[in-house]
Amino acid sequence: MKIKNSLKALKERHRNNRLVRRKGRVYILNKTNPRFRARQG
């Protein structure tokens, strides 16, 4: 999982990326291609 300051560019890298908020953190999750997962930090 990558940790990035800004997730806007990462969200557009794959069409199945989903923006999810969990416990005050923002994640990008992708079920079809998990290598695009990222967390904002």
UniProtKB/Swiss-Prot annotation:
Superkingdom in the source lineage: Bacteria
GO biological process terms held by the UniProt record: translation
UniProt keyword terms in alphabetical order: Ribonucleoprotein, Ribosomal protein
GO molecular function: structural constituent of ribosome
Entry-linked InterPro entries: Ribosomal_bL36 (IPR000473), Ribosomal_bL36_sp (IPR035977), Ribosomal_L36_bact (IPR047621)
Example of a GO cellular component annotation carried by this entry: ribonucleoprotein complex
One Pfam family per UniProt: Ribosomal_L36
PANTHER family attached to this UniProt entry: 50S RIBOSOMAL PROTEIN L36 2, LARGE RIBOSOMAL SUBUNIT PROTEIN BL36B
Family as reported in the entry's similarity comment: Belongs to the bacterial ribosomal protein bL36 family.
Protein name in the entry: Large ribosomal subunit protein bL36
